[in-house]
């Protein structure tokens, strides 16, 4: 597995990489890449940690599973590469950003620009078989990303957690609301966005909180 990851994350997660479950996960993922079509490409598996170093972390957004359509997943939750049509959840995210902050809907769905400002775009599971949703669930990724969230909760305060949907809310439950800003809403999926994602104003609320503790706002 090609582990391209910011050096501070590598140090923080080094013990996790040595645990038996992670070795088993690595073997499974290598075998999958060798025998099947897997997304994202291997060099992008840990891209969320490479684009958003731990020392720059301001916001955590938790997704569930990489996109399993051709050419979509790029290692950041909800994000797609330049030139790829926006999946429905990402369309809804951009509409809420526009309504909330007045920013125009961007031409690219590549969220590198968010990650580079300190937004960790973390899927709970970091790989998936082409066209098979949740096909890599239950193989150890969830344990690893739980450890990531735990490491943030233990080492950082003043973080904005955007928890969209019950899955993300369970995964982010360890974060202390007294020491951080916890923003909860339904998932931006078309199935649920109209039940409270639209109008949640998470993006402006995140920036208000960041500015209140002396941090620069995110240019959404």
Give residue spans per PLM region.
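Generic N-terminal amphipathic, Lys/Arg-enriched alpha-helix
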Residues: 1-13
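A polyanion-binding, active-site-adjacent surface
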Residues: 3, 15-163, 167-170, 175-177, ...
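Short, conserved glycine- and acidic-residue-centered signature motifs
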Residues: 199
